[in-house]
């Protein structure tokens, strides 16, 4: 005679342990949370402190290099704002391999778009303008002409501060003027404010306190 097997109730699975929960959560973690966002170029931040007992090059110090968005912000949030630097100090941000001096191979035929600030603008505009300048550089904001950009410098001075973007070839009118127009727009400068581009060679051989502008926007 056939026998009927008694029905069995499936045994419920035990609740997951904390370890299993953690493993499960890790599997679905958003990779955006731990993958850094690479920049197109590697950049070097330099600091200059004017000590008259030392040579110019001895006063120039490399702070750090970075090539991701996250590493840039970690560095920027760690250092002093430009407005807090002592007069005579500079920050320079240049593509890795280019030193922040006229004599560098990439700079010697170039020039700079120069922003001059009065003393009152140190508190109102200096830090904002410098950050926007840096973001223009690392974000490659100058379209097809970003390769012409070498770096940027902020000079903190008692008489008035300066910010400049350096380009590699002062004779390249198309690249230089495009960079100048984009830069002026990014800083939010009104049309009546004119900024000028000066070659490093003219700056080095100037007679008097001013250097003639090759281009203006």
UniProtKB/Swiss-Prot annotation:
The modification N-acetylalanine is found at residue 2. Keywords: Acetylation, Cytoplasm, Initiation factor, mRNA transport, Nucleus, Phosphoprotein, Protein biosynthesis, RNA-binding, Translation regulation, Transport. It is found in: Cytoplasm, P-body; Cytoplasm; Cytoplasm, Stress granule; Nucleus. The keyword Lyase does not apply. SUPFAM superfamilies: eIF4e-like (SSF55418). InterPro entries: TIF_eIF4e-like (IPR023398), TIF_eIF_4E (IPR001040), TIF_eIF_4E_CS (IPR019770). Residues 37-40, 73-77, 132-139 are annotated as: EIF4EBP1/2/3 binding. The modification Phosphoserine is found at residue 209. Its main location: cytoplasm. GO terms for cellular component: cytoplasm; cytoplasmic stress granule; cytosol; eukaryotic translation initiation factor 4F complex; nuclear body; nuclear speck; nucleus; P-body. Residues 1-27 are annotated as: Disordered. Phosphorylation increases the ability of the protein to bind to mRNA caps and to form the eIF4F complex. Phosphorylation also enhances its mRNA transport function. Phosphorylation at Ser-209 is not essential for protein synthesis. MRNA binds at residues 56-57, 102-103, 157-162, 205-207. It comes from the Eukaryota. The keyword Membrane does not apply. Disulfide bonds: none annotated. GO terms for biological process: mRNA export from nucleus; regulation of translation; translational initiation. The modification Phosphothreonine is found at residue 22. GO terms for molecular function: DNA-binding transcription factor binding; enzyme binding; eukaryotic initiation factor 4G binding; mRNA cap binding; RNA 7-methylguanosine cap binding; translation initiation factor activity. Acts in the cytoplasm to initiate and regulate protein synthesis and is required in the nucleus for export of a subset of mRNAs from the nucleus to the cytoplasm which promotes processes such as RNA capping, processing and splicing. Component of the protein complex eIF4F, which is involved in the recognition of the mRNA cap, ATP-dependent unwinding of 5'-terminal secondary structure and recruitment of mRNA to the ribosome. eIF4F is a multi-subunit complex, the composition of which varies with external and internal environmental conditions. It is composed of at least EIF4A, EIF4E and EIF4G1/EIF4G3. EIF4E is also known to interact with other partners. Interacts with EIF4ENIF1/4E-T; promotes recruitment to P-bodies and import into the nucleus. Belongs to the eukaryotic initiation factor 4E family. PANTHER family: EUKARYOTIC TRANSLATION INITIATION FACTOR 4E, EUKARYOTIC TRANSLATION INITIATION FACTOR 4E RELATED. This is Eukaryotic translation initiation factor 4E. The lineage of its organism: Eukaryota, Metazoa, Chordata, Craniata, Vertebrata. The gene is EIF4E.
